[in-house]
UniProtKB/Swiss-Prot annotation:
This is Probable transcriptional regulatory protein ZMO0153. It is found in: Cytoplasm. One of its GO terms (biological process) is regulation of DNA-templated transcription. One of its GO terms (molecular function) is DNA binding.
Length: 249
């Protein structure tokens, strides 16, 4: 998603990531527990759990925390979380898909609706946004994993469908059904990835001007700050110069 990784870097430079470390661990822990409950509590036998554990490690979550999250699932402890997806629109008509894990759907719906309405957006109906996205597998590696040519060749050999590389990371896209097979092949070549997940890839992007971009990024940040929100997908494109200026504010 164009602009998204740069937005993450801007937030990092502002020091926001350090302040949100515990919140991040909470989200990662929740996903590990839900993934463990969805199948066997063994990452080697449960692809979703393996991906969740990989994401937790990449997020800097201590091994003990990860093991406790799995133990909650084995022991039947912890809340029962429901996976809910919301669709909406932001400034400039940008489409948003908001994936959540919640133990209180009324609270989550209210928070999502409020975040949208206060930042130039509105909640849509089911299917109002997803038709403009493709459901695909997404494997991410840091830029240091290799130059774009090396990553492209490895991804092609592993059966991926597309690769996009930036100064920060490599995004490797696969067919939905091939995600974990491709991830396994790539891990043997490139090492453990930063992330392995099912994703929503926009079919087209909307270019957002500077005024709307600031509001849009605040909206995404507000949504991602919510404890129940796991991931926000969007179809925006923001020029690099605009992103740099926003990062200096």
């Amino acid at each position: 998603m164009a602009g998204h990784s740069k937005f993450k870097n801007i937030m990092y430079r502002k020091g926001a990531q350090d302040k949100k470390r515990s919140a991040l661990f909470s989200k990662l822990s929740r996903e590990v527990t839900v993934a463990a409950k969805s199948g066997l509590p063994d990452p080697n036998a449960n692809p979703r759990l393996r991906a969740a554990v990989s994401a937790a490690r990449s997020g800097g979550m201590p091994k003990d925390n990860i093991e406790r999250a799995i133990a909650k699932a084995i022991g039947g402890d912890g809340d029962n979380y429901e996976e809910l997806r919301y669709e909406g629109f932001g400034p400039s008509g940008v489409s948003l898909i908001i994936e959540t894990l919640t133990d209180n759907r009324n609270r989550t719906a209210t928070n999502v609706r409020t975040a949208l309405s206060k930042n130039g957006g509105n909640l849509g109906t089911s299917g109002s946004v997803t038709h403009g996205f493709d459901r695909m597998g997404l494997i991410t590696y840091k830029a240091e994993a290799g130059d774009p040519d090396k990553i492209f060749e490895a991804a092609l050999e592993a059966g991926a469908e597309d690769v996009t590389s930036s100064e920060d990371e490599h995004e490797i896209w696969t067919a939905q059904a091939d995600l974990h097979e491709v991830a396994g092949k790539l891990e043997a070549i490139l090492g453990e990835p930063e992330g392995v997940k099912l994703a929503w890839r926009p079919q087209t992007l909307i270019n957002v001007d500077e005024e709307s971009a600031g509001t849009l990024l605040r909206l995404i940040e507000t949504l991602e700050d919510d404890d129940d929100v796991q991931t926000v997908w969007a179809n925006y494109d923001i020029d690099d110069e605009v992103m740099e200026r926003l990062g200096q504010e």
